[in-house]
């Protein structure tokens, strides 16, 4: 609050009044100054000021309303948590949208079956005349471990596919995992995911956030018919400050929570609280978790694989926006941010894509000189 000056502060030469040379302190607190200045404003300016003030109040009101709604939803959601004390009673499923993943899908399915997932729902978003998942894992489909939903030929459907999986299954399963084919959960000291999820530290947690740990291309150029864990063991070096891309999360959410809609790829439902892998409730910054864990509980993210496979990934298009990611220099700036940049690799990318990566060559030369 602004405090008016006392009499001592207003001590000045009265002759200055005759010369209209008001001291700054008087002019600052002069109540008539506002009226004089109003005359200088045009009607348009006054309208703009009124609109700005209105916008501030409306924004504040909406923020307050959202905060109240979030608090109420937090309380409401936690009332629906169903606790299970026996691993045998716990039911866990995996929801995975995919496109052009036939090379990797069998290893992915086998991995999650091995760690105790009860069922996998694959959302087939391939082109209508594209590859078919049924050709690769017929035995898992036949025995009911994998169920395929047909979303072939549809664009910009990632969020809808994820929400569809939740709405169809939240009454049946205690936990629903929303991971993609290049994401493998890592649980130190746990060989079965149910033993991890049934832990009492998650008794009041509607969601569990785990960080991505990126794996590099291991300087590989071509596809090899081996599991990605064998091909790409090298992890990206994580800086001490653990900022930026290193605190991206993906989410496991409880079932039996009604009136929810999946509205975010990373955090699933924005207004529902979540915990880290240690059971501590955390506040995300957008879809980043400041309190990371890269040692005990995280997701091995094989996002790029080899150079050829990364180019194929760009060609298949984006499941959120629907368009194909053009071969732009910025795309490979991101790629080389994770992976070792060499002259050979730059020239290979240029040859495969037609890109001009001369700026990267300059950067490489500058690094060698320094």
Where are these regions (language model features)?
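N-proximal low-complexity "stem/linker" segments adjacent to membrane-targeting elements
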Residues: 11-110
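An acidic- and aromatic-residue-enriched active-site/binding cleft used to recognize and process polar
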Residues: 97-100, 125-128, 151-154, 181-182, ...
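Short, acidic, metal-binding catalytic loop of nucleotide-sugar glycosyltransferases
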Residues: 110-119
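Short loop/turn motifs at secondary-structure junctions
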Residues: 116-117, 172, 180, 204
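Short hydrophobic alpha-helical runs that function as membrane-insertion/retention elements
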Residues: 119-124, 146-148
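Active-site-proximal specificity loops/subdomain of glycosyltransferases
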Residues: 129-178, 186-187
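Catalytic-site signature of metal-activated, phosphate-bearing donor transferases
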Residues: 158-163, 187-370
């Amino acid at each position: 609050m602004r405090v008016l000056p006392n009499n001592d502060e207003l001590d000045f030469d009265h002759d200055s009044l005759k010369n209209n040379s008001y001291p700054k302190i008087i002019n600052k607190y002069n109540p008539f100054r506002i009226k004089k200045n109003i005359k200088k404003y045009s009607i348009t300016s006054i309208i703009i000021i009124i609109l700005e003030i209105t916008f501030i109040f409306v924004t504040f009101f909406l923020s307050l309303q959202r905060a109240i709604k979030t608090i109420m939803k937090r309380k409401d959601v936690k009332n629906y948590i169903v606790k299970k004390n026996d691993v045998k009673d716990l039911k866990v499923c995996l929801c995975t949208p995919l496109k052009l993943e036939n090379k990797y899908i069998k290893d992915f399915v086998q991995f999650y079956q091995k760690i105790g997932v009860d069922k996998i729902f694959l959302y087939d978003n391939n082109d209508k005349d594209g590859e078919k998942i049924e050709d690769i894992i017929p035995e898992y489909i036949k025995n009911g471990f994998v169920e395929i939903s047909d979303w072939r030929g549809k664009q910009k459907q990632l969020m809808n596919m994820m929400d569809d999986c939740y709405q169809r299954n939240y009454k049946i399963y205690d936990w629903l995992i929303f991971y993609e084919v290049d994401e493998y959960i890592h649980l130190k000291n746990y060989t079965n995911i149910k033993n991890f999820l049934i832990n009492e530290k998650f008794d009041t947690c509607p969601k569990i956030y785990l960080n991505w740990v990126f794996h590099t291309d291991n300087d590989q150029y071509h596809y090899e018919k081996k599991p990605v864990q064998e091909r790409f063991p090298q992890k990206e070096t994580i800086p001490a400050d653990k900022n930026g891309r290193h605190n991206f999360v993906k989410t496991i959410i409880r079932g039996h929570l009604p009136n929810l809609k999946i509205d975010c790829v990373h955090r699933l439902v924005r207004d529902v609280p979540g915990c880290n892998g240690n059971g501590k409730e955390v506040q995300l910054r957008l879809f980043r978790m400041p309190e990371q864990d890269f040692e005990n509980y995280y997701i091995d993210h094989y996002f790029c694989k080899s150079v050829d496979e990364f180019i194929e990934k760009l060609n298949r298009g984006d499941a959120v926006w629907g368009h194909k990611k053009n071969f732009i220099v910025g795309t490979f700036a991101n790629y080389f941010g994770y992976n070792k940049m060499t002259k050979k690799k730059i020239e290979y990318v240029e040859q495969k894509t037609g890109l001009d990566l001369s700026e990267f060559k300059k950067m490489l030369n500058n690094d060698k000189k320094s």
